């Protein structure tokens, strides 16, 4: 049991109830589930709740296309979501829906408190209106020609071709994506939440340590731009909750969606006698509330949500933790390449524990994107889980059953056990701070030690010698005890494996019994715990995902794609003497790390083979620091040092690409050596 039991409520962002879960979504639920399971393993009271986000125009229109009521559609989707989550071993304490009585009641209560306190304003606005469907059109339901690059069939708020953002009224030849009709402008009175009234409180809150520094920095930019009143209403027809005392007006989905956290917890409290809703959500609550979210919804969770809670007299979250996106094989998930993988497609072909481990091995507390490299995925799972972890038991358990009656020996030399147990607080701290990758590396380093011990001791040789039977018994028992400790450390990540190991060892794996003496303890006969990942299974997933595209994809509009030379024409000629002034050198990236004060920069220590230079490079959007260390690259070595507010930059690394994720540093041939001049 933990020294001081904590009361914790943890949430993941609510999946939208108009489609299936994919592997990008699963990152967040796996990350949160690991954290929740860890808290419970340590003896804390922890409740992991979630719900389907079930309101909005997209759901209303999709249900119409299917010829069913929205309520029927969201019920079907919720059933599919719950099955996917359960099969991925996501252990919610409650999974509900925002379209619920609890959420309707709480959303109305929050709104009325905000209204009565003077935080709700009204304003008449003009919007595009579909005259055939008699409905106002959200930006994404208006299409037309981009006013900048003239590409056709672009959305009402941004262009996929050139990346421009604009107002729907700027579109050329706009049309309704619902009916195809030409929209008209129409006035309507809307309700606004007075977000600027909470600016002082929000500035204090975001700098209180409740957010990652990267998030706090980003929010600081929004304050510089000035907070705006937030439109919280939508006009009928709309699938959602009607606003109290305002017929024909509905809550915008982003108002009742975060209240859905409270609604799901309220539903759980109604099912149980030992839970009190107010103990977690009242202004003076001492419980902890944590939200795990994607970086794309930081604005809603770190500005609107805490301001709404403050205005309604409720407590704010203890912390909001954001993560990055998932890429596959170094690129955005793609339906045409078969890398836009649904959770169910994965589950039809591979063990969910594989992905849980791979994500854990690459997750940190930062907001970096995570790349699911499918070859690396197979190699890492096969090496770490099958080759190191499970192999430890498979090499030794048979001897215990066949030669020693299935009973473990009293271990004379406990030095290895002591060294493994000495890591428990280090590993626990990594879990607590969401540094799962560091935890996995620590655990696998222990697995290497345990396997080396077995290899050096060679019980398969000892067992052949009559006078070495006790020594063989000791080695195998010691190995299985180390295996037990390792699986206990991994239990939040690999719950199904832990369950199978508990059946094999005939004991529960808990943090409290890590140091238990197993002398004389009887184990069951060993059965295979995990199979290797075969590339044919991965190939089957990719092929199945391509087939999904053929069934569901909409016809794509051909776009004129400019070549790199067209986008970035060659500059004016320079003389050879001008070029000769630039000293390009091979450098090895000795160290790479984040710059807390900057959103786009990484700090690099570049080894020139006898001299080290510090460079601040704007490549954070494309690279995680750990992926750069050890790589060779090319740098401008004689660039004048530049004083920046976080240090001096002594050069520049070379990279190609338009920017963002599409940026690649120059990597010379492996025969090149640090310090060599590029000629």
UniProtKB/Swiss-Prot annotation:
The record's annotation in InterPro entries points to: aa-tRNA-synth_I_CS, Anticodon_Met, Met-tRNA-synth_bsu_C, Met-tRNA_ligase_1, Met-tRNA_synth, Methionyl/Leucyl_tRNA_Synth, MetRS_core, MetRS_Zn
Q: Which residues bind ATP?
A: 335
Pinpoint motif 'KMSKS' region by residue range.
Answer: 332-336
User: What are the entry keywords?
Assistant: Aminoacyl-tRNA synthetase, ATP-binding, Cytoplasm, Ligase, Metal-binding, Nucleotide-binding, Protein biosynthesis, RNA-binding, tRNA-binding, Zinc
Q: Could you say which EC number(s) this protein's record lists?
A: 6.1.1.10
Instruction: Give the subcellular location.
Output: Cytoplasm
tRNA-binding domain: from which residue to which, for each copy? 578-679
- Look up the domain of life of the source: Bacteria
Cofactors (names): Zn(2+)
Per UniProt, Zn(2+) binds at 146, 149, 159, 162
Residues forming the motif 'HIGH' region are 15-25
Q: What is its main location?
A: cytoplasm
GO-annotated cellular components: cytosol
Q: How does it assemble?
A: Homodimer.
NCBIfam families from the xrefs?
Answer: metG (TIGR00398), metG_C_term (TIGR00399), PRK00133.1 (NF001100)
Function of the molecule: Is required not only for elongation of protein synthesis but also for the initiation of all mRNA translation through initiator tRNA(fMet) aminoacylation.
From the Swiss-Prot or TrEMBL record, give the protein name: Methionine--tRNA ligase
Q: Which organism is it from?
A: Shewanella halifaxensis (strain HAW-EB4)
Q: What gene name is listed for this protein? A: metG
């Amino acid at each position: 049991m933990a020294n001081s039991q904590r009361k914790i409520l943890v949430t993941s962002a609510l999946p939208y109830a108009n489609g299936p879960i994919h592997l990008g979504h699963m990152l967040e639920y796996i990350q949160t589930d690991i954290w929740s399971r860890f808290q419970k393993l340590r003896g804390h009271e922890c409740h992991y709740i979630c719900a389907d986000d079930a309101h909005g125009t997209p759901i209303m229109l999709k249900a119409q296309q299917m010829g069913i009521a929205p309520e029927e559609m969201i019920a079907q989707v919720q059933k599919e979501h719950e099955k996917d989550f359960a099969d991925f071993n996501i252990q919610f304490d409650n999974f509900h829906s925002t379209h619920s009585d609890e959420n309707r009641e709480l959303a109305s209560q929050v709104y009325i408190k905000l209204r009565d306190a003077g935080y709700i304003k009204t304003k008449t606005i003009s919007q595009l209106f579909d005259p055939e469907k008699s409905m106002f059109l959200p930006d994404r339901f208006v299409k037309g020609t981009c006013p900048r690059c003239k590409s056709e069939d672009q959305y009402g708020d941004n262009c996929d071709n050139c990346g421009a953002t604009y107002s729907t009224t700027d579109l050329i030849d706009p049309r309704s994506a619902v009916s195809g009709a030409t929209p008209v402008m129409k006035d309507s009175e809307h309700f606004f939440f007075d977000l600027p009234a909470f600016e002082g409180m929000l500035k204090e809150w975001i700098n209180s340590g409740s957010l990652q520094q990267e998030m706090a920095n980003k929010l600081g930019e929004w304050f510089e731009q000035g907070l705006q009143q937030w439109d919280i209403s939508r006009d009928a027809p709309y699938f959602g909750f009607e606003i109290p005392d305002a017929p024909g007006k509905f809550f915008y989905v982003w108002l009742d969606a975060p209240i859905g956290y409270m609604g799901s917890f309220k539903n759980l409290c109604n099912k149980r006698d030992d839970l009190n809703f107010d103990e977690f959500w009242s202004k003076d609550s001492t419980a902890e509330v944590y939200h795990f979210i994607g970086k794309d919804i930081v604005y809603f969770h770190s500005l609107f949500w805490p301001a709404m809670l403050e205005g309604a007299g409720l407590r704010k979250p203890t912390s909001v933790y954001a993560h990055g996106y998932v890429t596959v094989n170094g690129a955005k998930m793609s339906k045409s390449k078969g890398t836009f993988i649904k959770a169910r497609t994965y589950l039809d072909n591979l063990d969910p524990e594989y992905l849980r481990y791979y994500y854990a091995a690459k997750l940190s507390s930062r907001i970096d994107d995570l790349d699911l490299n499918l070859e690396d995925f197979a190699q890492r799972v096969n090496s770490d889980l099958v080759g190191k972890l499970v192999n430890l038991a498979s090499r030794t358990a048979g001897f215990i059953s066949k030669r020693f009656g299935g009973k473990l020996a009293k271990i004379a030399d406990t030095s290895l056990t002591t060294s493994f147990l000495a890591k428990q607080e280090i590993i626990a701290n990594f879990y607590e701070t969401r540094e799962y990758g560091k935890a996995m590396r620590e655990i696998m380093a222990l697995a290497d030690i345990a396997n080396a011990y077995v290899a050096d001791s060679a019980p398969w040789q000892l067992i052949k010698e009559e006078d070495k039977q006790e020594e063989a018994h000791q080695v195998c028992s010691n190995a299985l005890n180390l295996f037990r400790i390792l699986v206990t450390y991994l239990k939040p990540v690999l719950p199904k494996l832990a369950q199978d190991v508990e059946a094999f060892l005939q004991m529960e794996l808990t943090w409290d019994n890590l140091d238990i003496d197993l002398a004389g303890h009887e184990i069951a006969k060993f059965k295979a715990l995990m199979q290797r990942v075969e590339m044919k299974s991965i190939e089957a997933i990719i092929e199945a995902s391509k087939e999904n595209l053929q069934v569901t994809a909409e016809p794509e509009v051909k776009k004129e794609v400019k070549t790199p030379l067209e986008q970035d024409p060659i500059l004016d000629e320079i003389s050879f003497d001008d070029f000769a002034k630039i000293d390009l050198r091979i450098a090895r990236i000795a160290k790479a790390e984040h710059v807390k004060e900057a959103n786009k920069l990484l700090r690099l220590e570049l080894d020139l083979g006898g001299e080290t230079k510090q460079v601040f490079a704007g490549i954070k959007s494309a690279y995680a620091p750990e992926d750069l260390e050890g790589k060779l690259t090319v740098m401008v070595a004689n660039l004048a040092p530049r004083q920046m507010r976080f240090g001096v930059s002594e050069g520049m690394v070379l990279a190609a690409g338009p920017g963002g994720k599409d940026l690649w540093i120059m990597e010379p041939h492996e025969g090149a050596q640090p310090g060599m001049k590029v000629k």
